[in-house]
Amino acid sequence: MLRIGLTGGMGAGKSTVARILADLGAVIVDSDVIAREVVAPGTEGLAALVAAFGSDILAADGSLDRPALAAKAFADDAARAKLNSITHPLVGKRTAELIGAAPAEAIVVQDIPLLVENGLAPLMNLVLVVDVPAETRIRRLVEFRGVAEADARARIAAQATDEQRRAVADVLLDNSGPEGAVEQVVRELWERRLVPFERNLRAATPAAPGTSELRVDAERQAQAQRLVARLAVAGGAAAARIEHVGPTAVPDLPARDLLELQIVVADAAAATGLRDALGAAGFPAMSGEGSGALRAAAWHGSADPGRPAVVAVRVEGTPEQRFASALGERLRGDAALREEYLDVARKAEAEAAGSVGAAAGAAFDAVLHPWLAEVAERLLGTV
């Protein structure tokens, strides 16, 4: 099962994207719908709200009078906390039920307006953000929903900023164009990334490596941090720390499109214990341990074809852990070492040219890895 988080600011067109994904076969779990469902007439949720805030929060027909509840529940922090203590567990329980009922091969899209505000992005295998400039969203709310402009501005100001949403976005869906323009983008995303991602997850197979072409990509640092956040949730207390390592950890250094991450653990047993959790987070286990300075207690690879990555789980204090932690810093500060790397990496790029997927990765590694082993011998005495 692939779990996708879908979010966007008010007026961005998130519901439109959700409908397209549903048409393509996704299972949609809409948090707004669930929030209404758990406080419908006759539910334990509504009964708990009445007990907490009084019967005057009910409409004449026995349903929840939302403005009346808001007047009481948002009066102060204590009242808001009381409201959340009632509704959040019920929403969480119902969400878990719906996800649990989905088929094993499902692509589950959780439509969550406050995904960023509630810190839920690392719980998802992938996050889609529907992106529209705030002024455009305000205009849409005023023209198409009849919201007063002052109210629209106030409500948007109370949500996460566009920059905060973009920071968690694995995929940014620009919906600022004409009606219907985003549909083709979503359909291509479904076919090229989401379906293969789910297939890889179900088969416990990492995605094929990315291109071996050397290039600088300003997005890699943010991409790595999103993966680090997911690995931190999956690793829990067993992960002492998680690092972006290797050439892609150096922002201005040309590198192939393969993020390298390292999870540092206390011992080999901890590495073994992470296997299932990392797999569920989108990082299936890989065979082998490697050798020498490139050895790891366990290797995992991203199942996402849109963001190739490898994850080495290494024991704290081992030579291979110390080398991986130090290499990026040395590449940043040692001009001579950078030139060495670039010379070898260009040779590896040439060797991999003409090959694709795993074959290209193997050809690249066959040139790069001996140099890394030699550098490790030089550096380990100093780190």
Curated annotation (Swiss-Prot):
Compartment annotation: Cytoplasm
Protein EC: 2.7.1.24
Region (UPF0157): 196-383
Reactions performed catalytically: 3'-dephospho-CoA + ATP = ADP + CoA + H(+)
Domain of life (superkingdom): Bacteria
Entry GO CC: cytoplasm
Gene3D superfamilies, per the entry: Beta Polymerase, domain 2, P-loop containing nucleotide triphosphate hydrolases
Alphabetically ordered keywords of this record: ATP-binding, Coenzyme A biosynthesis, Cytoplasm, Kinase, Nucleotide-binding, Transferase
Residues at which ATP binds: G11, A12, G13, K14, S15, T16
Listed Pfam families: CoaE, GrpB
Entry annotated with the keyword Nucleotide-binding: yes
GO biological process: coenzyme A biosynthetic process
Keyword hit for Transferase: yes
Molecular function as annotated in GO: ATP binding; dephospho-CoA kinase activity
Domain DPCK, first and last residues per copy: 3-201
InterPro entries (alphabetical): Depp_CoAkinase, GrpB/CoaE, NT_sf, P-loop_NTPase
Function, as annotated: Catalyzes the phosphorylation of the 3'-hydroxyl group of dephosphocoenzyme A to form coenzyme A.
Family statement drawn from the similarity comment of this UniProt entry: In the N-terminal section; belongs to the CoaE family.
NCBIfam families given in the database record: dephospho-CoA kinase, PRK03333.1
Name of the protein this chain belongs to: Dephospho-CoA kinase
Protein source organism: Nocardia farcinica (strain IFM 10152)
Recorded name of the encoding gene: coaE
